[in-house]
Amino acid sequence: MVIQEKFVVRAPIRKVWEFTINPEHIGKCVPGCEKIEKIDEKTYLVIVHAGVGPIKVRFKFTSTMTEIDEPKHLHIESKGADMGKAGSFTQTSDLDLREISEEEVEISYKSNINVVGRIATFGERIMRAQAKKIGEQFIRSFTEKIEAKKEMTP
């Protein structure tokens, strides 16, 4: 399943980049994120809870930043499983920043997600709808936090 989106934030590209590559900041924007633990400079252990239909899951996974082209591109590879054995997933994501002006950045992302197991039985339509809902919540939270962070900076 491929999920992609574009949105614009009002902040300088450097601030957006620094926020984006900080997993603790990003974790606060991800609905259901319970934990982010640094393994090394590019790899993090993450626990996120979510629901798809009647199934509630807690995914434990690692995410690794495998390509970094500062301040415009980030490639992340993730792999993990539900702690309750409802399924597992792999994901590759590309995030691109494009400076529109000194105070505006377009963010585009594309994620290719492969889910297997009981959770996959709900089909792409239901999982896509849930992913869209989570994506919208993430974008709203990300935008609010980065724009608030900009206002707090002298």
Go through each PLM region and give its residues.
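Hydrophobic ligand-binding cavity/cleft-lining segments
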Residues: 1-47, 51, 153-154
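Hydrophobic/aromatic beta-strand elements that line small-molecule binding cavities or substrate pockets
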Residues: 5-7, 34, 60-67, 90-99
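Glycine-rich portal/gate segments that line the openings of hydrophobic small-molecule binding cavities
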Residues: 38-81, 137
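Beta-strand/loop substructures that line and gate deep hydrophobic ligand-binding cavities in soluble
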Residues: 80-129
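A conserved amphipathic terminal alpha-helix motif
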Residues: 118-154
